[in-house]
Amino acid sequence: MAALKDQLIHNLLKEEHVPQNKITVVGVGAVGMACAISILMKDLADELALVDVMEDKLKGEMMDLQHGSLFLRTPKIVSGKDYSVTANSKLVIITAGARQQEGESRLNLVQRNVNIFKFIIPNVVKYSPHCKLLVVSNPVDILTYVAWKISGFPKNRVIGSGCNLDSARFRYLMGERLGVHALSCHGWILGEHGDSSVPVWSGMNVAGVSLKTLHPELGTDADKEQWKQVHKQVVDSAYEVIKLKGYTTWAIGLSVADLAESIMKNLRRVHPISTMLKGLYGIKEDVFLSVPCVLGQNGISDVVKVTLTSEEEAHLKKSADTLWGIQKELQF
């Protein structure tokens, strides 16, 4: 008696399954899973692979997502401790690493995470030599440099999530003050993701109307409205969320899916993300910092040359020096 499947279905074609739009997420902690669900909800991949060292947690997360398949449009969700499950990925998102503790600076995490990357990156490269690498783990600017060094990839294919979230937080808070949706509030935070990020006050606008032109004290200590506080809130926000709920997830997950969409759909949108800045803004070392970048199917194809004040440029240079001071001490 023929099996039920054979009675029901007549096969016409022996297919070899090679995914066309595969995305891998390395690390199934709170951030990794927020990235995964955000990507699934945006229908960006035909296959999603999850990788972690904690096998039970990994299998549980995979099964939980698979059970939602009816409500998703990603036909294959796989997982494994072995990196062979990641083969043929277009995009590999790295969220694995030691988690930032309450009150711990992002830079303090660094050597702990370098050691983790020494295992992850060669395995990713082995199975997906043509992928784009999107680094999310903190401190993101330094770890993007680490991923670039270990992978041997050209710099366009190694991207740090950088200030994409900082800028999104900034635009949200700007919108709250002005009573306008964040999408219509334009403002950029550049430089280091974290404590020494640089708000570009001159670029803040709604409908092309410059806030700095209307309110020349914007971002200065003399400002009666204290817009500087908005940037301070951005810097403090991750620490506050970590203090309140233990970690940050949803905003970073949505932010990463936003970047993944630009890459997978070759949108060529401009994002404030971490890229190799040597030779720009007076920076002479191999450091990764966030500037507005054109993001598409080849990763970062172009960088927008932002007009910075001498103070802003000095701030960026100081961040670069701080990062380089740490990078040159790293043990690979």
Swiss-Prot record:
A GO MF term: L-lactate dehydrogenase activity
N-acetylalanine sites (modified residues): A2
Subunit-level organization: Homotetramer. Interacts with PTEN upstream reading frame protein MP31.
Source taxon at top rank: Eukaryota
Name by which UniProt lists this protein: L-lactate dehydrogenase A chain
NAD found in the keyword field: yes
Binding annotation for substrate: R106, N138, R169, T248
Cellular component aspect of the GO annotation: cytoplasm
Signal peptide range: none
Source organism per UniProt: Oryctolagus cuniculus (Rabbit)
SUPFAM superfamilies assigned: LDH C-terminal domain-like, NAD(P)-binding Rossmann-fold domains
Modified residues (N6-succinyllysine): K5, K118, K318
